[in-house]
């Protein structure tokens, strides 16, 4: 009975975290922190029932050091409320480490992510067919309080050819499509083949990214795919790459004739003025200025927006800045100083290195997709971190943290 209760609570906890990680800026966004707190409470209950915690070792040590550092920095943070909120999220992930997820739970979480990504992909396609799907018919998914500003932003994006579907924000939607591709890719590179239905899902995820207009989040899965082919596939690497390019071009040509909006992303690649780097250099300058002023401890994790706004950073309408530095590395320097940034960089590097080592060390196919999923999510996070805010958005921070827990507790048969 005790074991059954633990199993059910663990699955509920993972379901809640998957909902946070893979639903974007939809109606759940207002409750993301609350959902994470409930998941944290469930984690505590699970540990109490089990009366034991997992051994702290490997990547867990580095994550714990980062968590302790963020917790300690609350005392020196210029805006402790923001730092405290993020600290609670890190504690939530820390509890998942302490619980020590078994293989079945990790596969369960991956399947949840794939299911949610599929829902978002289908909703993006539906939004192309019915442009006012989430601004008129299902507006409560985008904004339960019927915020006209949110609906106006969605309408403006749709008018420009940028779709986000159920995720209700183009960057969030493109990120979720990347997670869907990570699920599919983990299966493919485990067996060098996959179910036919998953080829269809892979195409839908790619189409979903194209319809969001987010170039960086389109480039990332392509880069990861090529790297994975060169390093993981055992034979016909070049042939597979060339075949994938030809097939991709053919599919895009056919699909773009049926859905003209697919061309928006590629049109934006050729535009000089765009939102990949436009204005970001200014955000980075503020981050570097904060780092120079507070070089050792920084201004506090999550405090960039408040501090930069105090120093004069605003939107074009003169509203205080609220969407971070669009580069996690510059922002870490500003918020955690040289000490905290070093801890994070060690966490990033050791996470990738440890995952690759375990992929090579263990040969059980039923565990390999878990490690590959973890590797792909980590790579998405670190690459997207060059122009985005993946460790500052609740959804994406949770996904990155969970991916790290996946490389802990590996008790597999060695080669």
Model-assigned labels for residue ranges:
Residues 1-50, 66-76, 381-383, 402:
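N-terminal signal-anchor transmembrane segment
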Residues 2, 15, 37-52, 178-190, ...:
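Hydrophobic, aromatic-rich transmembrane alpha-helices
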Residues 110-144, 149-159, 165-231, 379:
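Alpha-helical transmembrane segments of multi-pass inner-membrane proteins
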Residues 270-289, 293-336:
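Long extracytoplasmic/lumenal interhelical loops at the membrane interface
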């Amino acid at each position: 009975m005790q074991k059954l209760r633990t199993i059910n609570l663990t699955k509920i906890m993972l379901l809640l975290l998957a909902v946070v990680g893979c639903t974007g800026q939809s109606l759940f966004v207002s409750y993301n922190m609350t959902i994470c707190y409930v998941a944290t409470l469930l984690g505590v209950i699970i540990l109490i029932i089990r009366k034991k915690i997992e051994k702290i070792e490997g990547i867990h040590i580095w994550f714990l050091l980062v968590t302790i550092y963020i917790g300690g920095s609350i005392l020196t943070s210029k805006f402790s409320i923001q730092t405290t909120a993020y600290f609670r999220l890190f504690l939530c992930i820390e509890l998942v480490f302490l619980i020590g997820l078994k293989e079945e739970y990790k596969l369960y979480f991956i399947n949840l992510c794939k299911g949610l990504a599929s829902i978002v992909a289908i909703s993006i396609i539906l939004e192309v067919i019915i442009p006012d799907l989430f601004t008129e018919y299902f507006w409560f998914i985008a904004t339960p309080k019927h915020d006209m500003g949110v609906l106006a932003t969605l309408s403006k994006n749709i008018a420009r050819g940028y779709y986000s579907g159920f995720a209700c924000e183009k960057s969030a939607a493109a990120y979720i499509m990347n997670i869907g591709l990570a699920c599919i890719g983990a299966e493919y590179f485990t067996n060098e083949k996959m179910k036919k239905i998953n080829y269809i899902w892979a195409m839908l995820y790619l189409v979903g990214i194209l319809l969001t207009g987010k170039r960086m989040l389109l480039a990332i899965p392509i880069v990861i795919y090529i790297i994975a082919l060169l390093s993981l596939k055992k034979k016909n690497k070049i042939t597979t790459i060339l075949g994938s390019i030809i097939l991709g071009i053919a599919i895009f040509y056919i699909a773009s004739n049926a859905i003209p909006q697919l061309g928006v992303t590629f049109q934006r690649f050729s535009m000089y003025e765009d939102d990949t780097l436009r204005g970001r250099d200014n955000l980075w300058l503020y981050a570097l200025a904060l780092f120079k002023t507070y070089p050792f401890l920084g201004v506090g994790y999550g405090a960039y927006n408040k501090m930069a706004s105090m120093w004069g950073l605003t939107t074009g309408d003169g509203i205080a800045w609220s969407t971070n530095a669009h580069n996690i590395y510059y922002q870490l320097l500003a918020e955690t100083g040289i000490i905290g940034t070093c801890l994070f960089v060690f966490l990033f590097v050791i996470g990738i290195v440890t995952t690759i080592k375990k992929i090579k060390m263990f040969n059980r196919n039923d565990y390999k997709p878990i490690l590959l999923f973890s590797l792909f999510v980590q790579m998405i996070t670190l690459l997207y971190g060059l122009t985005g805010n993946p460790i500052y958005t609740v959804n994406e921070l949770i996904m990155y943290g969970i991916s790290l827990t996946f490389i802990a507790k590996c008790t597999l048969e060695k080669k």
